[in-house]
Each structure stands twice: as structure tokens, then as C-alpha cells.
Amino acid sequence: MTVYYCDVKFERLPLRFLTAFNPDGKVNTIRFVPVPPEKTTPPTTSVQDKIKETDIQVCTGNFKLPGTLTLPKNGKDLPVVILVHGSGASDRDETVGANKPFRDLAYGLAERGIAVIRYDKRTKVYGADSAPAGKEITFDEESVDDALSAIKLARSIPTINPERIYILGHSLG
């Protein structure tokens, strides 16, 4: 997929005009999105001292979604919260402008002894290829199937208690 964008200044806020084309050169996406912030605020040293993060991959069939497992620095037999996105193509942090609510939730929960799984949404990673060719994406394909795969992943992580897996959804999630 090829993506082009142009930042546009409006009276109240800047927006990014984004256009994506599939390999055949056909338009895949046209949308306005928030302009990414110049930089994000990293967690404070005290948070970094209490948590650890590991790259993970949530796999549903051929769809491989990059994600992050956030854990307390020490602990075993941990409960885990799986964060599920709202509508739209969202990253694992559910980034909106300078806000990263899923990242912030992950850090806060991990500081309190709860592991968190968050992952890039299928529509963020695969766009129109998220659904079978020529078909509209279903709710299961957009959210449910990947959340179920995240549960399966959580059950395979040695430090996670498989009886204490929770789902926290935002909006459509």
C-alpha cells in the first residue's frame, strides 16, 4: 500500500489529509486524521522503574498484529487486561493527537500489578485487506476475532494467570 499525506492548517486545528492506494493503484483510503504531535511524553523514570514491556504479536490466521505486553517489573500469576479498540484504524496506544489512552492505561495498570496486552488494530495494519476480497469487513473480523486471539496469546504467557483474563473495550471495542 502506498500512502500520501498533506498537513492542512484550518482555523481551529491542523489536520492531515491522507490518501492510500492499494498495489493496483486504486484508492483504498481517503480521510482526515489528527496531525501527529512533534513528540510524545515518555513515561516518567518512576514508571519505567516499575514496569517492563515486551513486543508481542497477536495472530489470527494470516493476520499478524504487532503489539505490546506491559507487565509489572516483578510478579507472577498476574491478571491481564486486553485492550480492544473503538472504530477506525487505531494503533496499539489508541493514539489521538498527542493522547495515547491505551498506553497510559497500560502503564497505570502495570504499576498496580496488572499485565496489559495491546495491539495495533487489524484495519490499521492491513487496511482494506482486512476483509476477504470483494466483501465488507464484519464486526468479528474488525475486532472480535483478534480479541479472541489475544486471549489465546495471554493464556500462553507463563506469568499470566489464565483464570484472570479481562477485556476492556473502548467505543466499538
Question: What do the PLM-derived regions correspond to, one by one?
Answer:
Residues 159-171:
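Alpha/beta-hydrolase fold nucleophile elbow
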Residues 25, 36-37, 64, 75, ...:
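Solvent-exposed loop/turn segments at secondary-structure junctions
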Residues 136-158:
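Alpha/beta-hydrolase active-site loop
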Residues 18-40:
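Short beta-strand edge/turn micro-motifs at domain boundaries
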Residues 78-81, 164:
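Alpha/beta-hydrolase fold active-site loops
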Residues 1-23:
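Exposed beta-strand-loop-beta-strand "reactive/processing" segments of non-cytosolic proteins
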